[in-house]
């Protein structure tokens, strides 16, 4: 176990682990709605649906799409302030331009500093790529953990309500996990909601029903009630995460109190062409306004 991941990298309980893993679940649960629309009564068990989802997820090209969007985030990264940022996605990582803090636009001095930071990225793109690689490592770990879902959870209570499939999940007592991320994530219970027509996830939430402890609680404990939720929406034929909420409370390393919370809302999505360079992304994010390249969320529907 790497204790540094608990105290240094968003407590080791990364948003990508809590929200991202289940967003991947939602991206792959297409088979539920498709089967229902064609044959009526659900022909698959919940476990079969989850396994089919995992098999289909790698075939979905949507995760390669790039966007420009507006982000409002309060997290450890923002010093618990609400940051409003314009974000442009590239294959190498996300370029961010800070627009406001706690609802207040940047001063001229702050804006100059922000533009200087972006200029440094253009001057040293390799440094930017190196810094962004940690996030990509997290995503790779999330993909590995995704494959453990059929063993880690019991999925049940599948029902159709007003055109939305709903499914509950809770820990599988026969499963075993290693490391605090797996132990916390796979100790959660919750539910997912899936648009039956579009065959995409709309909402997912999970909550710890009891404490999760490492080293009899002396090394780390995540408290009962810690939770996450995530919402997705169809943006012109492209399904995107529009809200992620994470709230983790606990202690680590001999009773040190730990509290990690994040609240991220994304809007104003605009589809981008493939192959945008880091320099082009910086120019776009500094220019402001929507990106009207080959198409946007209203004009392009693949």
Label each PLM-derived region with a short phrase:
Residues 1-11:
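N-terminal secretory signal peptides that target proteins for export/translocation
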Residues 28-36:
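Signal peptide processing junction and immediate N-terminal pro/mature segment
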Residues 35-189, 197-202, 207-225, 231-240, ...:
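Structured extracytoplasmic
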């Amino acid at each position: 176990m790497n204790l540094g991941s608990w105290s240094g990298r968003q407590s080791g309980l990364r948003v990508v682990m809590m929200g991202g893993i289940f967003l991947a679940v939602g991206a792959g649960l297409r088979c539920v709605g498709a089967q229902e629309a064609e044959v009526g009564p659900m022909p698959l068990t919940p476990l079969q649906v989850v396994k089919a989802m995992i098999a289909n997820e790698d075939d979905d090209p949507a995760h390669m799409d790039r966007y420009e969007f507006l982000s409002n985030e309060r997290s450890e990264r923002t010093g618990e302030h609400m940051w409003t940022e314009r974000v442009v996605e590239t294959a190498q990582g996300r370029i961010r331009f800070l627009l406001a803090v706690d609802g207040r636009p940047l001063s001229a001095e702050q804006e100059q500093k922000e533009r200087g930071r972006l200029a440094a990225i253009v001057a040293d793109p390799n440094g930017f790529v190196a810094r962004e690689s940690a996030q990509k490592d997290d995503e790779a770990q999330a993909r590995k953990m995704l494959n453990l879902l059929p063993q880690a959870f019991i999925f049940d209570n599948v029902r159709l309500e007003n055109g939305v499939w709903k499914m509950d999940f809770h820990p599988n007592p026969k499963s075993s996990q290693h490391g605090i991320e797996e132990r916390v994530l796979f100790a959660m219970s919750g539910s997912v909601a899936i648009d039956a027509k579009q065959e995409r996830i709309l909402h997912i939430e999970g909550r710890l029903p009891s404490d999760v402890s490492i080293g009899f609680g002396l090394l780390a404990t995540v408290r009962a009630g810690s939770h996450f939720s995530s919402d997705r929406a169809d943006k012109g034929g492209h399904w995107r995460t529009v809200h992620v909420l994470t709230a983790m409370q606990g202690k680590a390393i001999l009773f040190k109190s730990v509290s990690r919370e994040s609240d991220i809302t994304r809007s104003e999505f605009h589809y981008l062409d493939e192959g945008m360079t880091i320099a082009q992304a910086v120019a776009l994010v500094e220019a402001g306004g929507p990106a009207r390249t080959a198409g946007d969320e209203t004009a392009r529907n693949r």
